[in-house]
């Protein structure tokens, strides 16, 4: 990895997506993250493997359309997001919730 990419690792992964569908996918060892919309699959894979110390065996990405929002008479668009569904090797796990 180049030094430029090393400094960007934490910027590629924005946050985990916690929805009912994403929570059900945890049983299949699949984790859903919101990522930078310019990131490619190899960059996402390298970032997940480096940040969480796991082995990624597959990535599916999606670019949902931007939604239009209105505030009074002004119309605008929300920022572009990209979601990545990451499938981990058997036995690997990412701790999303703190254990109690």
Curated annotation (Swiss-Prot):
Record-linked PANTHER family: 60S RIBOSOMAL PROTEIN L23A
GO BP of this protein: translation
Role according to the record: One of the early assembly proteins it binds 23S rRNA. One of the proteins that surrounds the polypeptide exit tunnel on the outside of the ribosome. Forms the main docking site for trigger factor binding to the ribosome.
InterPro entries, A to Z: Nucleotide-bd_a/b_plait_sf, Ribosomal_uL23-like, Ribosomal_uL23/eL15/eS24_sf, Ribosomal_uL23_CS
Keyword Ribosomal protein tagged: yes
Keyword terms, alphabetized: Ribonucleoprotein, Ribosomal protein, RNA-binding, rRNA-binding
A GO term from the CC aspect: ribonucleoprotein complex
Molecular-function GO term, any one: rRNA binding
Subunit and interaction comment: Part of the 50S ribosomal subunit. Contacts protein L29, and trigger factor when it is bound to the ribosome.
Residue ranges that the Swiss-Prot or TrEMBL entry lists as coiled coil: none
Protein name: Large ribosomal subunit protein uL23
Organism: Prochlorococcus marinus subsp. pastoris (strain CCMP1986 / NIES-2087 / MED4)
One Pfam family this sequence matches: Ribosomal_L23
Family statement drawn from the similarity comment of this UniProt entry: Belongs to the universal ribosomal protein uL23 family.
NCBIfam families xrefs: PRK05738.2-4, PRK05738.3-1, PRK05738.3-2, PRK05738.3-4
């Amino acid at each position: 990895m180049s030094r430029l990419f090393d400094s960007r690792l934490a910027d590629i992964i924005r946050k985990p997506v916690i929805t009912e569908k994403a929570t059900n996918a945890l049983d299949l060892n699949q984790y859903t993250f919101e990522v930078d919309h310019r990131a490619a699959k190899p960059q996402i894979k390298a970032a997940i493997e480096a940040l969480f110390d796991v082995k990624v065996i597959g990535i599916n990405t999606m670019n949902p359309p931007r939604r239009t929002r209105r505030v009074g008479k002004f119309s605008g668009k929300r920022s572009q997001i990209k979601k990545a569904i990451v499938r981990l090797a058997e036995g690997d796990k990412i701790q999303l919730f703190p254990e109690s």
